[in-house]
Amino acid sequence: MAGQNHHFGIYAPEKIPYAITRYVNETNRLYGVLDRRLAGQEFLAGDAYSIADIATYPWVVPWERQQQKLADFPHLKRWIGSLQSRPATVSAYARGEPFAAQPAVTEAGKNFSLGKLQQDLEGV
């Protein structure tokens, strides 16, 4: 859902209010699920750091771009802070820093991708 949130809120060439609202709200609901899960345990799958944490963390790091407020999710906020300070996380994000300033998709890439999709749909 966070991916759809990013697509409709950031990348889509046409801003569709219904889609943006739907995915912002769905992301909010899922943040609530994560927050409730983390209320009684340190990590998503229990008391040990696991692939569940590794796989989920990158989807919640851009919480501001997803139009979420961490103040609404205190357990999720704690978990993000905990993972953010892990040496492996610090190292991984430092290695990715040179790429972070670049757009994930260029305008030409967007146009190609969306144009290709349109061509595919017209061919159906």
Cite the ranges covered by each PLM segment.
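Conserved C-terminal alpha-helical bundle
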Residues: 1-42, 64-66, 101-105, 120-124
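GST superfamily/GST-like fold recognition
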Residues: 2-6, 44-69, 77-85
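Juxtamembrane/interface motifs at transmembrane-helix termini
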Residues: 5-9, 73, 99, 111-114
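Residue-level recognition of alpha-helical structural elements
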Residues: 16-19, 47, 69-72
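Charged catalytic carboxylate motif
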Residues: 26-30, 55, 75
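Surface-exposed helix-capping loop/turn segments at secondary-structure junctions
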Residues: 36-47, 88-92
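Terminal-tail/helix-coil boundary detector
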Residues: 89, 93-123
